[in-house]
Amino acid sequence: MDVRFDSYIYGKEIVMERSLSAGFQVNIGDVTMDFVTEAEVFSPQGADRGTLAMLSVVKLEESDKLLDLGCGYGLVGIWAAKQIGAEQVTMCDIAETAVKVARENCERNGVDVAVLKSDGLKDLPEVLRFTKILSNPPYHEDFSVPKGFIELGYKRLELGGVMYMVTKRRDWYYNKLKTVFGGVRVEEIDGYYVFTAEKRERKPVEKKKNEQIMSKKLQRKMSKKKKAHHSNT
């Protein structure tokens, strides 16, 4: 028996969710998904509103190679797999329970997605590169986790690839994404901030700036050496 039925609109998509005796069902547009989860896996009560806000702005292409970073029970990755194909999607999470539940949900929804245990992107096979990375990072006072997501995510994106993130906080994420990517778009949806950042350079902007600074320092150092050499001759 259904115990809850919710309906909300994000952009042009109608999202419907209902609780079932063994899990819950989520409809996003014409994509229908059935899920089970466990109490310690985010978010145990159903589809997270922040994640839904992020998905409302994501634009997928058939050629995309997508990473669901911090996949939880698998909503984002399964939603993407049903549209662009399971072979185009990778899901990962640091928690064994999340990986187990996400794999079960992939099977329930008929998509054979690779679900990997990884501390952020650190343990993913080096050969994997992506055109889209989607993440609803954990909220902590310490920003070390999202910092790693953003910096390593940039390296794993192909040129022209896009990172989407959703959070309750704006300033730190805006500043970090802008520093690494060189620019970021922010949309406020349903009380959440959705960030979209495109990789336009092969090296992070902050790294390029540091290299330029070091290059100038080296030039000045070489110039001083030349002057010292000429003064001694």
Language-model features, listed with the residues they occupy:
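N-terminal auxiliary segments of SAM/dcSAM-dependent transferases
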Residues: M1-G29, E40, K217-K225, H229-T233
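SAM-dependent Rossmann-like transferase core, predominantly class I methyltransferases
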Residues: E13-E61
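Conserved SAM/SAH cofactor-binding pocket of Class I
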Residues: R49-S135
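Short beta->alpha hinge that forms the Motif I/post-I loop of the SAM-binding pocket
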Residues: D93-A98, V145, K168-R169
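Conserved beta-strand signature within the Rossmann-like core of class I S-adenosyl-L-methionine
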Residues: G160-T167
